[in-house]
Amino acid sequence: MKTLLTILTVGSLAAHTTVDTSGLLQHVKFQSSNFENILTWDGGPASTSDTVYSVEYKKYGERKWLAKAGCQRITQKFCNLTMETRNHTEFYYAKVTAVSAGGPPVTKMTDRFSSLQHTTIKPPDVTCIPKVRSIQMLVHPTLTPVLSEDGHQLTLEEIFHDLFYRLELHVNHTYQMHLEGKQREYEFLGLTPDTEFLGSITILTPILSKESAPYVCRVKTLPDRTWAYSFSGAVLFSMGFLVGLLCYLGYKYITKPPVPPNSLNVQRVLTFQPLRFIQEHVLIPVLDLSGPSSLPQPIQYSQVVVSGPREPPGAVWRQSLSDLTYVGQSDVSILQPTNVPAQQTLSPPSYAPKAVPEVQPPSYAPQVASDAKALFYSPQQGMKTRPATYDPQDILDSCPASYAVCVEDSGKDSTPGILSTPKYLKTKGQLQEDTLVRSCLPGDLSLQKVTSLGEGETQRPKSLPSPLGFCTDRGPDLHTLRSEEPETPRYLKGALSLLSSVQIEGHPVSLPLHVHSVSCSPSDEGPSPWGLLDSLVCPKDEGPAVETEAMCPSAAASELEQSTELDSLFKGLALTVQWES
């Protein structure tokens, strides 16, 4: 046995000595990376430019050598045997034969080769993505020439099951961060913006103790432009807000209503009291016999002054603007009673109603003759005024074409006050009726005389409506008016009490009365001496004419209980009819 071992050792040494001494071929070996197997060799000192090389290979355990196609009699000094040795679980041998001109061939064989054990791992393919405060690293899979049973290429992760990645990040060679894992995506967080970092990625296989060369990437984090974005956003927002504000202000300016002129500033003018609106009712005549025909003629209305609302006993009487209404004027003389003292004359109310003891010139009343006097009513002095005496006077030469009365009684029912009237005040149980005797001439109206009828002599027609058309919004009131004398129970009574309570300023007589049946309906046929008063419009709520009969004093007393609507309308009112000549 010792002899056999000695012979084999000497023979091998002799063979190697023969190959090495030729100087044509040396350093035959496999170089494998990522399972790509390349056979390489070097020429010896005796090799020339015309030396050619041939390559053969075989699998471990086989006796027959296989020639590599494409690697026969070549002058280059490498041959790719990747496809011939792709089974990474097998062992292979390869040999190279060098032939020089005029010399014997020289052959050299490699050691046993296993790609799984002898292959090296290349650096991984990594992409480094810099961010403002982080760096992201993506590892791409590495493909190998090794084919699976189904024919697709295998990756390193599929061949080396224990493979993992090691990542390092260096900052100025003083600070480093480490990450490891089998995943393919990694990110280093918390970095400084606008700073350069050096990263390295290595593949490790613990079982075979393989380690790839590191992949090095130099990357710089992005600068922090957050403040720029914030500032830009704030500027854009401010500009948008400013544009919106300008548009809104422009819209408000365009749609703003114009400022009214100072001439329409009513509050500046009406400084004494707020503006009040009163309801007016105008009596419109529908027939005037004074004209040449029966058609309605233009009519001028006189000024009618109506006393204010009634006040409770003892209260100071004040006139209100809502109690007065002006409806036209006509050129006639002013009549007044003669028995009223001049110092007790009360001027018509002005725009600033005040209860004053002195007579003030009216600010809106027509001009009055020097001898004109107005009825004075002064309950403040506590005087008892005797009723004025009426004497028949001559017929007026000039009478108004027509007149109408408009009254807005804003007061409410209250206890009758103390009044001084131009009419005789009747005692309780007595009734005095005045009849109006009137004469109508073409284009002229004359008032005749006043006939005073005593008790028992009063006869009334069956139909005696109010001789003066009157409109009001106030319902009937059955209370009576009382004077300061306790024996005087009533102020106005009867259908003609209105005309009998009217005093014409500027003339000492009262309005003449005459018993005459006047119809308030404008549809009555036939002309009448009372055509002027017939033409006045009746109240809107007036019904048919109330039938009256001749009454004795007892009948007159019963009539006191049934007051007409006209009595209730003029209750508590001291009427003064004024014509301006």
UniProtKB/Swiss-Prot annotation:
Pfam families, alphabetized: Tissue_fac
Any Gene Ontology CC annotation: plasma membrane
Record-listed cross-link Glycyl lysine isopeptide (Lys-Gly) (interchain with G-Cter in ubiquitin), residues: 449
Domain (Fibronectin type-III) ranges: 18-115, 141-221
Organs and tissues of expression: Expressed in kidney, liver and lung.
Residue list for modification Phosphoserine: 410, 414
Coiled-coil region: none
Protein name, as recorded: Interleukin-22 receptor subunit alpha-1
Disulfide cross-links: 71-79, 128-217
Gene name, Swiss-Prot/TrEMBL: Il22ra1
